[in-house]
Amino acid sequence: RWELEKAMEVYAANDCTVISDEIWSDLIMPGYTHIPTQSVSRDARERTVAFYAPTKTFSLAGLIGSYHIIYNDRLRCRVQRQGNLSGYNDCNVLSMHALTGAYSDEGMAWLDQLCAVLDRNLRYIRDFLQSRYPGVTMMLPQGTYMLFVNCGAWCRSHGITPDDLRRRGVEHG
């Protein structure tokens, strides 16, 4: 929360409009809570355009189901005016049912199970990498299933650069 509060102070001091990608906000690992950008202050609520979508979390890519939350009337009008130009943002019947199902009690129960499985898998990957590749470190994510692996110490101990490691991964898999 404090990171968002500090960032919003900088944005307020510079009169910035904030676009907040909250699309991963449903995919939170056990023991953590998502903090929406707009919730940290009244100013954050007024200057932030927040985008959400069930597509990544519920594997609904390809369906039109993203949405935004904009409290500021001026910003909302600007976003809607631009969004309406493409004609692509009109929700269809399939998308409406998918969105409703995703956020139903059954969908939330499925999501809880998914997050528990992802958490176990992420811990397995961390333990595997650290046991087989001394010097490789990573932090478990609080949300999403994306990993950022630090191979710097492992590369130094093997006399290669991170670019060499990346190249080997591309060329040899």
Residue ranges, per PLM feature:
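PLP-dependent class I/II
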Residues: 1-173
